[in-house]
Design a protein with these regions (language model features):
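Collagenous Gly-X-Y triple-helix signature in extracellular proteins
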Residues: 11-243
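Short, intrinsically disordered N-terminal pre-domain segments
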Residues: 1-11
């Protein structure tokens, strides 16, 4: 006796999610994530571990996204303390901000170990498996293409992302510029400034480097990493889920 094949298959079986895989997207591409029910543009700024650097562990091997425009202006910390791990901005990024993302986004974003300078007058960089466990984070100065050859006070708390250009030339600066309400504005980084305990690096409104006290309200551009298997809708480029 043979087995009957029911036309249409199992009606309870979910259809596979299809779309454009994050890992196939060109660096510089724009995609969309949902924030508070609104589709917001993010740029693909790197594929894989930045510069294949051992500062990053395998958790950072994915598709790096950076919010195209500045989200808002807020202080890095409530006091002039540049200890990133305990900062108000790290708490906000992984709390209030992350909770505004859609359920698809929250499920897809990777938990990673990001390299970071301890701060508070301590220039030690914790990296690899000792990095800070986060889902959303600020970029560092080296990731934007600056190094200690540009300014001694830059800590080596990351390596250049593919989207950015090394140095301080006009084209390198142009790629770092971000806007708030359609006007270029300064945005803050996770890199503490120098050996002091109260200031942090920022990217100014011309794309050059600057710094500010940690309690100053500067622009915030959240970054996050998706698995390369995450899928985007072919028409809208909105994140759909994972394969």
């Amino acid at each position: 006796m043979g087995f009957a094949i029911v036309a249409g298959g199992n009606p309870n079986m979910a259809a596979p999610v299809t779309g454009i895989a994050a890992g196939t997207l060109a660096v510089g591409s724009a995609v969309k994530l949902m924030e508070s029910g609104t589709a917001v543009e993010y740029l693909v700024v790197n594929q894989g571990k930045p510069s294949n650097s051992n500062l990053y562990d395998s958790s950072c091997d994915g598709t790096w996204l950076l919010r195209k425009n500045i989200h808002s202006q807020r202080p890095w910390n409530s006091s002039n303390s540049n200890v990133y791990a305990n900062s108000a901005i790290n708490t906000w990024l992984n709390g209030d901000f992350f909770n505004t993302l859609g359920s698809v986004e929250q499920a897809a974003v990777k938990q990673i170990k990001i390299p970071y300078c301890v701060g508070g007058g301590n220039s030690t960089v914790n990296s690899g498996a000792n990095g800070l466990s986060v889902k959303a984070f600020l970029l560092g100065g080296y990731e934007l293409g600056w190094t200690s050859s540009n300014l001694d006070n830059f800590h080596h708390d990351g390596d250049k992302l593919e989207y950015f250009i090394s140095g301080t030339g006009a084209e390198a600066n142009r790629k770092r510029i971000a806007t708030l309400n359609n006007s270029p504005a300064q945005w803050t980084l996770r890199t503490p400034y120098g050996e002091g305990s109260g200031a942090v690096f920022a990217c100014d409104n011309t794309g050059g480097y600057g710094y500010d006290l940690a309690s100053t309200s500067d622009g915030i551009r959240p970054a996050l990493i998706l698995p390369k298997t995450a899928l985007f809708d072919e028409d809208t480029m909105i994140l759909k889920g994972a394969a």
